[in-house]
């Protein structure tokens, strides 16, 4: 029988995920600009939803690109 260990979240439980913190948000994006899933990032469900909202806000305000044009060319 396998023993599963819970991963520690890279963001502390009460840390605020700010849409203006582009450096933090970019750690959770792929090279193509997609948001990494929970199973890879190790975030909790609540943190992942807050991260998703923050990334979407940052994209709308042009702080983050919607897609990485360097990958297309």
From Swiss-Prot:
GO terms for cellular component: chloroplast; ribonucleoprotein complex; ribosome. GO terms for biological process: translation. It is found in: Plastid, Chloroplast. Transmembrane segments: none annotated. GO terms for molecular function: small ribosomal subunit rRNA binding; structural constituent of ribosome. InterPro entries: Ribosomal_bS18 (IPR001648), Ribosomal_bS18_CS (IPR018275), Ribosomal_bS18_sf (IPR036870). Keywords: Chloroplast, Plastid, Ribonucleoprotein, Ribosomal protein, RNA-binding, rRNA-binding. It comes from the Eukaryota. Disulfide bonds: none annotated. The keyword NAD does not apply. Gene3D superfamilies: Ribosomal protein S18. It holds the Pfam family Ribosomal_S18. Part of the 30S ribosomal subunit. Belongs to the bacterial ribosomal protein bS18 family. This is Small ribosomal subunit protein bS18c.
